[in-house]
């Protein structure tokens, strides 16, 4: 998966970190990223279950964006990503939007971004999270 290729931590590590933070009287904020290559309705449901198990105090829901200067931006083919914009000024760091990336599945070449399935999965997760606990939302890249 993209997360493994990018060298990101596993869900078990994230869960343990949130538990330790909360156990020590601090608030845990999690970043939930959707729109990764290979994402499916099933993986969104798994993300929802993970959030239920995690019980974060705050959450931020973002659409995957390979920012200029990152390893994914510099080598998109290795991660199954196609870059839509090449200049950093075309990205809004704090609030990435659905128009910033053009993702495709490497194996099939199927376009994902600006695809109704991708947007529907993102909006489904965003609205589910907001319904779960609206006070927990700090901000999101959802703009519709």
Per-segment meaning from a language model:
Residues 1-143:
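A structural motif corresponding to the C-terminal lobe/cap of the Radical SAM core domain
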């Amino acid at each position: 998966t993209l997360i493994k290729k990018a060298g990101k931590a596993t869900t078990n590590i994230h869960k343990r970190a949130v538990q330790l933070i909360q156990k020590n009287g601090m608030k845990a904020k999690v970043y939930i990223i959707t729109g990764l290559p290979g994402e499916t309705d099933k993986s969104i449901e798994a993300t929802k279950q993970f959030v239920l198990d995690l019980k974060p105090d705050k959450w931020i829901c973002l659409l995957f964006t390979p920012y200029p200067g990152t390893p994914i931006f510099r080598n998109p083919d290795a991660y199954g990503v196609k870059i839509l914009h090449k200049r950093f000024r075309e990205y809004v760091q704090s609030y990435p939007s659905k128009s910033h990336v053009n993702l495709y599945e490497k194996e099939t070449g199927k376009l994902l971004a600006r695809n109704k399935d991708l947007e529907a999965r993102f909006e489904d997760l965003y609205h589910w999270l907001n319904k779960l606990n609206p006070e927990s939302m700090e901000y999101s890249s959802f703009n519709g």
